[in-house]
């Protein structure tokens, strides 16, 4: 009886997990109040930041999005990847 109960619990957890979809912030602003459901296969939240020339000075740019893989950081580009809902705030 205990084995049957344990099996049912495990199956329930696995089935519930299959329907999970990631929620990430997806915008190009410093403040990002809304989140979106990521499409299938994109279960990583990414936040990229860099400095760009704007007018007579420098401007900090930020982009948040869903991704299938974590892109590499490069010189001048900071990348933060995470795997929980809205973790790329």
Curated annotation (Swiss-Prot):
User: Which residue pairs form cystines in this protein?
Assistant: 24-45, 27-32, 38-66, 70-81, 82-87
Keyword Disulfide bond among record annotations: yes
Show the SUPFAM superfamilies listed in the entry.
Snake toxin-like
Gene Ontology annotations for the cellular component aspect, listed alphabetically: extracellular region
Q: Where in the cell is it found?
A: Secreted
Under the heading Pfam families, the entry gives: Toxin_cobra-type
Tissue specificity: Expressed by the venom gland.
Q: Which GO terms describe its molecular function?
A: toxin activity
UniProt keyword annotations, A-Z = Cell adhesion impairing toxin, Disulfide bond, G-protein coupled acetylcholine receptor impairing toxin, G-protein coupled receptor impairing toxin, Hemostasis impairing toxin, Neurotoxin, Platelet aggregation inhibiting toxin, Secreted, Signal, Toxin
Checking CDD domains in the record gives: TFP_snake_toxin (cd00206)
InterPro entries per UniProt: Snake_3FTx, Snake_toxin-like_sf, Toxin_cobra-type
- Show the Gene3D superfamilies listed in the entry: CD59
Q: Does the keyword Repeat apply?
A: no
Q: Which positions make up the signal peptide?
A: 1-21
Q: What is this protein's function?
A: Exhibits M2 muscarinic acetylcholine receptor (CHRM2)-blocking activity, but has a weak binding activity toward nicotinic AChR. Moreover, it inhibits collagen-induced platelet aggregation.
Its family? Answer: Belongs to the three-finger toxin family. Ancestral subfamily. Orphan group V sub-subfamily.
Identify this protein by name. Answer: Long neurotoxin homolog TA-bm16
Q: Which organism is it from?
A: Bungarus multicinctus
